[in-house]
Amino acid sequence: MDKFLKEFKDRGYFYQCTNENELSKLINKEKIKGYIGFDCTAESLHVGSLLQIMCLRLLQKYGHRPIVLLGGGTTRIGDPSGKDKTRRILTEKEIDKNTKNIEKILKKVLNNDDPKTKPIFVNNYSWLKNLNYISFLREIGKHFTINKMLTFESVKTRLDREQSLSYMEFNYMILQAYDFLELNKKENCSLQIGGSDQWGNIVNGTELIKRYSSKQAYGLTTPVSYTHLTLPTICSV
């Protein structure tokens, strides 16, 4: 096992991986780029973001380059994961302010000294805002089936409880998968890291990349509950 994944597990960060053996081989062979997406629904980060930040720092520690994806576009829709009702739709001004604040915070806590591991900051609004709906359905939508989308926890839970799920929210998982595809094409990003509640969305991304370009990409998730971790374990990277 490579040193990155070993420490990832030793620290208790590990929950699931789409193809652990192949990811380990890739990391042993070359330096990679991995990304984590951050929601921009609030002016600042919450305590749950701490583990994700440490994952980015761990990538840097072993010579890999992290990509911070700011969800300026997807925040305009709202992630239904873990929610039993539709999120409040924020104004454009609120989202832009939140995005700038979160980027400022993350630039302070990540290592910017080494140009090889310096974080790359992207905002998915830059590519989502100009999507052509017909082209998107033809090129991307054809790779998703309603049958499978209905099995994901974020959707299934709402429907089982007979709670409404808007068409807007239903599209969130497709857009997140598309984010991974865009980063794979533009930055050669081969890894997405996220909380275990994002597993379905992350798997969608790896599968979309495989179908669209026949390239291999990987997903790695962390526990949503951090009760098994101590603060020094999380923060000492």
Question: Where are the regions a protein language model picked out?
Answer:
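Non-catalytic terminal extensions that flank enzyme cores
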Residues: 1-40, 216
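Divalent metal-coordination and catalytic microenvironments
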Residues: 8, 46, 121
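Divalent-metal (Mg2+/Mn2+/Ca2+)-assisted nucleotide/phosphate chemistry catalytic cores
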Residues: 11, 91-92, 98, 108-221
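N-terminal catalytic cores of NTP/NDP-binding nucleotidyl/phosphoryl-transfer enzymes
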Residues: 22-80, 192-201, 205
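A charged helix-plus-loop insertion that forms the helical arch/lid used to bind
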Residues: 80-96
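Active-site and channel-lining beta-strand-loop segments
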Residues: 220-229
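Single conserved hydrophobic/aromatic residue that forms the stacking wall/gate
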Residues: 228, 233-237
